[in-house]
Amino acid sequence: MAESEKEAALPPKEEFSDWYNELLWMAEIMDVRYPVKGLYVWYPFGFAIRRSTYNIIREILDNSGHQETLFPLLIPENEFMKEAEHIKGFENEVYWVTHGGKDSLDIPLALRPTSETAIYPMYKMWVRSHADFPIKLYQIVNTFRYETKHTRPLIRLREITSFKEAHTVHATWEDAEAQVKEAVELYTEIYRRLAVPVLRSRRPDWDKFPGADYTDAIDAMMPDGRTLQIGTVHHLGDNFAKTFDIKYEAPDGEQRYAHQTCYGISERSIAATISIHGDDKGLVLPPEIAPVQVVIIPIIFKKGAEEVLAACRDVQERLKKTGVKVEIDASDLRPGAKYYRWEMKGVPLRLEIGPRDLENNVAVSVRRDTGEKEQIPLPEIETGVLQKFEAIQNSLYEKAKVGLESRIFDCTELEEVKEKIQKGVATIPWCGKKECGLAMEDRIGAGILGIPLTPRGKGKEKCPVCGAETETRVYVARTY
């Protein structure tokens, strides 16, 4: 490896924080040098990953009856302050616009931290009858929160550049509950497409979304054993409907308050994907979101160079016709330097074609995730590449799933939990009482994620705080 390449080597992934920060700029995901804390710039390569990721999100939502929309960024203070419990959760994080030019505004305007108070005044005007339901809208927007904690690109931001928020309206509490369940499944499907296995749980009441009846959440296990919240789904009951006077005419002619849900997902989805799959060489991307899915490396010698380049161009055109995003690296860099470059960018599949390969009418494929080499006959290159993509996708998911499950530890004592959460997620019996939950968090030094949506109970057990019998276990973890 050349000296310049040594200088550009990533820290090992086991040094996760340094690895993550270096990878973001070495793979050209984000530039962190913007002169405002917590605001970052997408490189074109990173933005292409973002675009493909959000295309998946749009596809899954659109196919389940959601419609995309767009609401304003600015929220009048009088609307923003209507929902007291909701505002209590955000009041210290709001950016306020107080002037237009040199003139003071009569009503200050909030930069949305989230859009309930922007959308629900419009729902009051739009909702008329039970026949209007369900309303299932979503938007993908930037949101702003004055984070005072340590910011980290894609994970903790002052400007969330890619916030997908859905807001639904229903006739009954039960209809809204069914929508929550659907949303959890949709998010699970989104992450399955990203080859990211998830933990699904119901947050404890003290950690639910401000103003919600309850919150279900999706978490990913990061390489350092901490969990990252990568999706939330909130049952709002009729709380916001009462605040914003969202009523409908029921079949019996009575006016009733609507019931609502909201659910969000952000660029943390990308943070989880690159963190879980990446390795010491750089990104390892699922084929569906890779800006370059195949890179063709011509193996050039003086003799037969034109024939090799012509064959590479032919393969490129054939793959493009099947929808594959493919590049040829015919630069003057030596092959090892080319491999380094494209491995850093996580290109799922490398094809090498040289004079000997042409004689045998094959291309040599090299998988980014495993390094496995295999010949693909050139007449079958299209089907061969697509089969490799499917194998890579399945392999990434299964590897991540095994990794997640191997780091979930069922515990019975709080001291054991303190030890195990240094490696991953612990489960522990809990009676359900708030005072016991808070005492547990205090003694463990970590938070209760929530009650698994797929129960992990082992029959009757005892709460480690009060000794009461319970069949419920909760996830406990260190979190981002």
Swiss-Prot record:
Its EC number is 6.1.1.15. GO terms for biological process: prolyl-tRNA aminoacylation. GO terms for molecular function: ATP binding; proline-tRNA ligase activity. Consists of three domains: the N-terminal catalytic domain, the anticodon-binding domain and the C-terminal extension. This is Proline--tRNA ligase. CDD domains: ProRS_anticodon_zinc, ProRS_core_arch_euk. GO terms for cellular component: cytoplasm. Catalyzes the attachment of proline to tRNA(Pro) in a two-step reaction: proline is first activated by ATP to form Pro-AMP and then transferred to the acceptor end of tRNA(Pro). SUPFAM superfamilies: C-terminal domain of ProRS (SSF64586), Class II aaRS ABD-related (SSF52954), Class II aaRS and biotin synthetases (SSF55681). PANTHER family: BIFUNCTIONAL GLUTAMATE_PROLINE--TRNA LIGASE, PROLYL-TRNA SYNTHETASE. PROSITE patterns: AA_TRNA_LIGASE_II (PS50862). InterPro entries: aa-tRNA-synt_IIb (IPR002314), aa-tRNA-synth_II (IPR006195), aa-tRNA-synth_II/BPL/LPL (IPR045864), Anticodon-bd (IPR004154), Anticodon-bd_dom_sf (IPR036621), Pro-tRNA-ligase_IIa (IPR002316), Pro-tRNA-ligase_IIa_arc-type (IPR004499), Pro-tRNA_ligase_II_C (IPR016061). It comes from the Archaea. It catalyses: tRNA(Pro) + L-proline + ATP = L-prolyl-tRNA(Pro) + AMP + diphosphate. Pfam families: HGTP_anticodon, ProRS-C_1, tRNA-synt_2b. It is found in: Cytoplasm. Homodimer. Disulfide bonds: none annotated. SMART domains: ProRS-C_1 (SM00946). Keywords: Aminoacyl-tRNA synthetase, ATP-binding, Cytoplasm, Ligase, Nucleotide-binding, Protein biosynthesis. Its main location: cytoplasm. The keyword Transit peptide does not apply. Belongs to the class-II aminoacyl-tRNA synthetase family. ProS type 3 subfamily. Gene3D superfamilies: Anticodon-binding domain, Bira Bifunctional Protein, Domain 2, C-terminal domain of ProRS.
